[in-house]
From Swiss-Prot:
Key word Plastid present: yes
Subunit field text: Heterotetramer.
This protein's pathway: Glycan biosynthesis; starch biosynthesis
Catalysed reaction, written as an equation: alpha-D-glucose 1-phosphate + ATP + H(+) = ADP-alpha-D-glucose + diphosphate
Protein name per Swiss-Prot or TrEMBL: Glucose-1-phosphate adenylyltransferase large subunit 2, chloroplastic
One Pfam family, short name: LbH_GLGC
GO BP terms: glycogen biosynthetic process; starch biosynthetic process
UniProt GO molecular function: ATP binding; glucose-1-phosphate adenylyltransferase activity
Enzyme Commission number(s): 2.7.7.27
Tissues expressed in: Probably are expressed in roots, flowers and/or seeds.
Alphabetized SUPFAM superfamilies for the sequence: Nucleotide-diphospho-sugar transferases, Trimeric LpxA-like enzymes
Length: 518
């Protein structure tokens, strides 16, 4: 089904999928997982060689008078069961850092990778992890997000969840003083819907995942939950090494030798930032990488024991509104809060710059992240579009999505979204084009051109570089978008664009007149 197929990736002289490069790293801190029967699973830290001991011999020595066949092994670890896990995906705030892409949509609804939306990342990770009890909390500009979720993840014509469910919980006002306010933060959003865990559908839930709707990564959440169970944690925070240039944008933490978090600071600055430096070689990083990434950053992905989450939100910290800046730092001193090292690609799509870079990085060889994985596909709305039609084009290191028309144009290091139309002479370089929500017929296009109007797509002989083109944009003939003056920040909404971090952003449904130079 098209809903789980990625867009077509085109490289110079290469038309097809690339072999995925898989690597593993053994951590001196976290150890390597020993494969044993499920009832006898443990973790072995890297240390001096140890002699193997028969576990049944240990039992015969320690319990010589016990009937072995009538008792469970002493070394028993509970296995994580996805049926006992529920996930809550946060729809995000107003998304001011991603403006203007969030002017008419929620952050998780922002298109990415040619044919996906950001919400598809945590949703697909949940599905691939076997988690079928999913709540999505929405508030700001949630129309397109709700529409995408209803079209994609439902029982009728989307992904089949069996006995699971996907519930979209939109912010609403209820009786009482607290119910008269909108969400005040991530924790407050969950608090206002905490009653869902009293519902019959969640009676067997033991652990609750808190996920963000604006991150790009692939993760098996059940490995995360298993670590949470094995460490007997009340809360587990997924984390990764971070360099100094971006450390102040994240929650930072310090851990002890057992992986327990002993200090947590949300987005520290100045001296507070320096105080959070640690020797990340404890995570198994080589000395050079440890020196380059002297911080441990929270991914904003948490798992709570359900009863602990309810207690924290209801009674322990009833006025705390945010997980990262309030709940987690307060809980560190009173609860067993553990760290889980995620040693793979992860990107916070929080700014125009990071969004732009993460998209274009998908075209690189080899990419740090890719949607091409048969075992863990990413799902999206089934649009049933035809293949892309390419006529005498030059395409290098790019991704071209479904249902596009490309005529005698050049596309280099760019992403071309669904239903895009590029006319002859167009040059697209270092550009993320989101595509369109609809087609215009040849007759409609001819009529618009005859009237001096601009159809959806990119007109003849237009040159575009270092740009994000939002959906349904109409860009005329002989236009040049290159930010030749090197403007870092600029606002020209009356002409259909803004500039953020030196990147030109053409607005959704905007019209760029013929011959305009930006």
């Amino acid at each position: 089904m098209e809903s789980c197929f990625p867009a077509m990736k085109l490289n110079q002289c290469t038309f097809g999928l690339n072999n995925e490069i898989v690597s593993e790293r053994v951590s001196a801190f976290w150890g390597t997982q020993v494969v044993k029967p499920n009832h006898l699973r443990t973790t072995k830290l890297r240390s001096a060689p140890q002699k193997k001991i028969q576990t049944n011999l240990i039992r015969s020595v320690l319990t010589p008078f016990v009937d072995q066949e009538s008792h469970e092994p002493l070394l028993r670890t509970q296995n994580a069961d996805p049926k006992n896990v529920a996930s809550i995906i946060l729809g995000g705030g107003a998304g001011t850092r991603l403006f203007p892409l969030t002017s008419k949509r929620a952050k998780p609804a922002v298109p990415i990778g040619g044919c996906y939306r950001l919400i598809d990342i945590p949703m697909s990770n949940c599905i691939n992890s076997g988690i079928r009890k999913i709540f999505i909390l929405t508030q700001f500009n949630s129309f397109s997000l709700n529409r995408h979720l209803s079209r994609t993840y439902n029982f009728g014509n989307g992904v089949n969840f069996g006995d699971g469910f996907v519930e979209v919980l939109a912010a609403t006002q209820t009786s009482g003083d607290a119910g008269k306010k909108w969400f005040q933060g991530t924790a407050d959003a969950v608090r206002q819907f905490i009653w869902v865990f009293e519902d019959a559908k969640t009676k067997n839930v033991e652990h609750v995942l808190i996920l963000s709707g604006d991150h790009l990564y692939r993760m098996d959440y059940m490995n995360f939950v298993q670590k949470h169970i094995e460490s007997n944690a009340d809360i587990t925070v997924s984390c990764l090494p971070m360099d100094e240039s971006r450390a102040s944008d994240f929650g930072l933490l310090k851990i002890d030798q057992s992986g327990k978090i002993i200090q947590f600071s949300e987005k520290p600055k100045g001296d507070d930032l320096k105080a959070m430096q640690v020797d990340t070689s404890i995570l198994g990083l080589p000395p050079k990488e440890a020196a380059e990434s002297p911080y441990i950053a929270s991914m904003g992905v948490y798992v709570f024991r359900k009863e602990v989450l309810l207690k924290l939100l209801r009674s322990s910290y009833p006025t705390s509104n945010d997980f990262g800046s309030e709940i987690i730092p307060l809980a560190v001193g009173e609860h067993n809060v553990q760290a889980f090292l995620f040693n793979d690609y992860w990107e916070d799509i929080g700014t125009i710059g990071s969004f732009f870079d993460a998209n274009l990085a998908l075209t690189e060889q080899p990419p740090k992240f890719q949607f091409y994985d048969q075992k863990t596909p990413f799902f999206t709305s089934p649009r049933f579009l035809p293949p892309t039609k390419v006529d005498k084009c030059r395409i290098l290191d790019s991704i071209v999505s479904h249902g596009c028309f490309l005529r005698e144009c050049s596309v280099q290091h760019s992403i071309v979204g669904i239903r895009s139309r590029l006319e002859s002479g167009v040059e697209l370089q270092d550009t993320m084009m989101m595509g369109a929500d609809f087609y215009q017929t040849e007759a409609e296009i001819a009529s618009l051109l005859a009237e001096g109007k601009v159809p959806v797509g990119v007109g003849q002989n237009t040159k575009i570089k270092n740009c994000i083109i939002d959906k349904n944009a109409k860009i005329g003939k002989n236009v040049v978008i290159a930010n030749a003056d090197g403007v870092e920040e600029g606002d020209r909404p009356e002409e259909g664009f803004h500039i953020r971090s030196g990147i030109t952003v053409v607005l959704k449904n905007a019209t760029i007149r013929d011959g305009l130079h930006i």
